[in-house]
Amino acid sequence: MSISHIFGPQQPQYSSVTASAHGKVNLHLGVGPAREDGYHELDTIFQAVSLKEEVTVALRDARGAQDAEAVQVAEAAQEAADAAPCTWSVSGFDSHLVPQDSSNLAWKAVAAIQKLARQAHVPWADAPVHIHIDKGIPVAGGMAGGSADAAAALVAATELYFPDSRASRRPDGAQLSDIAAELGADVPFCLLGGTARGTGKGENLMPVIATGTYHWAIATDKRGLSTPEVFKQLDQQRAAASAASPKAARAGSPEGLIAALRTGNPEEVGKLLVNDLQAPAISLLPSLRETLKAAEEAGAIAAIVSGSGPTVAMLCASADDAVEVATAVSVAGKASSTMTTSSPAAAAGVIKREEVLE
């Protein structure tokens, strides 16, 4: 039976939708003291990079037989999230490291949109779905790969369940941003893309004007770092350094960086890259110091631990320079893998729709 005969008079317009969302680098990451809820106050400048994730959400009856590697989400998790039956599969960079359980942010994002679709009486809201993630961003590397999965899944699921952009029940940008913030602190920026200043946990965003294109060499480390552990190490380092309360943002104000971004001059931007989490990340993974040194020796304008690490982002003068720096760091044995990318990049968006066949 074709999918067009399953749902009665109101049929889905699409059998599957694919969306993409980009990773990020933190050009400035100032970390304040821990809050009562356990999070830290942040003052950060995000910039989206060309590395991206692609997420496809498909109505499973439209997809036919499932891939042999497809993983079934546990029924208990589906019931707890009030979600439709779901399978998923993963391909691409570090695909074997992607969590294949209910902690997966892409699945949580789809479940959130399914809930809205159910409230709006969308007939296919409870239909089984398949989620496929094609990864292009390092896993657990401080570049928001999981958050990009969630952002892309939000966009794809919204288009699948609410194909009419004029429909009153379709979640708008503000509502998607609210859902994104519930999923994770970096997810709202992965929806927005471009360049933005983030405060609070990073979810309160203000777009920043940036001109020019910035070229990066990226060095990954397969050992990974736990974000909570890096923040814990920062707190311990600060407590050991001073009995006084830590300042709200040890990296200082990002206003100088914001001004430099308007010029489009990578040399000026490079002078102002700063990350309060770099020292604790190096403390937990001392080899990062050698990676940063190798980047400098290879001719990078500047190098910085990306977010909570362990990925190192190396700002370069040109795309050719980025290739040379990435190659040099790799040959020196100071990274598990290297790649190049550029910034800024666009917002999350739909890249493919498959119409339902009659």
Curated annotation (Swiss-Prot):
Q: Which reaction does it catalyse?
A: 4-CDP-2-C-methyl-D-erythritol + ATP = 4-CDP-2-C-methyl-D-erythritol 2-phosphate + ADP + H(+)
Q: Where is the signal peptide?
A: none
**InterPro entries for this protein:** GHMP_kinase_C_dom, GHMP_kinase_C_sf, GHMP_kinase_N_dom, IspE, Ribosomal_Su5_D2-typ_SF, Ribsml_uS5_D2-typ_fold_subgr
Which biological process terms from the Gene Ontology are attached to this UniProt entry?
A: isopentenyl diphosphate biosynthetic process, methylerythritol 4-phosphate pathway; terpenoid biosynthetic process
Q: Name one Pfam family in it.
A: GHMP_kinases_N
Which Enzyme Commission number(s) are listed? 2.7.1.148
Q: Which UniProt keywords apply?
A: ATP-binding, Isoprene biosynthesis, Kinase, Nucleotide-binding, Transferase
Pathway terms, separated by semicolons: Isoprenoid biosynthesis; isopentenyl diphosphate biosynthesis via DXP pathway; isopentenyl diphosphate from 1-deoxy-D-xylulose 5-phosphate: step 3/6
Indicate whether Plastid appears among the record's keywords: no
**Broad enzyme group:** transferase
Where does this protein hold ATP?
P138, V139, A140, G141, G142, M143, A144, G145, G146, S147, A148
Q: Which GO terms describe its molecular function?
A: 4-(cytidine 5'-diphospho)-2-C-methyl-D-erythritol kinase activity; ATP binding
Which residues does the Swiss-Prot or TrEMBL record annotate as the active site? K24, D186
Cited function: Catalyzes the phosphorylation of the position 2 hydroxy group of 4-diphosphocytidyl-2C-methyl-D-erythritol.
Family per record: Belongs to the GHMP kinase family. IspE subfamily.
Name of this protein: 4-diphosphocytidyl-2-C-methyl-D-erythritol kinase
Its taxonomic path starts at:
Bacteria, Bacillati, Actinomycetota, Actinomycetes, Mycobacteriales
